[in-house]
Curated annotation (Swiss-Prot):
The gene is rplM. PANTHER family: LARGE RIBOSOMAL SUBUNIT PROTEIN UL13M, RIBOSOMAL PROTEIN L13. This protein is one of the early assembly proteins of the 50S ribosomal subunit, although it is not seen to bind rRNA by itself. It is important during the early stages of 50S assembly. Disulfide bonds: none annotated. This is Large ribosomal subunit protein uL13. It comes from Clostridioides difficile (strain 630).
Amino acid sequence: MKSYIAKPADVQRKWYLVDAEGKTLGRLATEIATVLRGKHKPTFTPHVDGGDFVVVVNAEKIVLSGKKLDQKYYRYHTGYVGGLKEISYRDMMDKKPEEVISHAVSGMLPKNKLRSRMMTRLRVFAGAEHTHAAQNPEVLNFK
């Protein structure tokens, strides 16, 4: 008996809705990354982009454990000499709460050519309202 290998044409995508209110950032990001990658499907194939769409709402109400609210920093470099910039988690949540979840999920996806395609299927919204009601997303509950 041969192993089944999914083809890109065979992939059927579903839409899922995740409420981030009161959830821990890392635990939620791992579950979202699993769905984006398609590992929850029995037809998972590593080299085929077979994941589903994920809509995350209430990104501004996500929590971190411990003192990370004050101690966690996001760092990036501008490319110029002395161009290392950093922004605290608290400031990031005030300015762009969607970026916090996107950054965490992106770090949990494989670092290859499929990553950007997987990230385009992640839609994050700061509040409870989202623009994908027409897709009838199925509510996805995590522990």
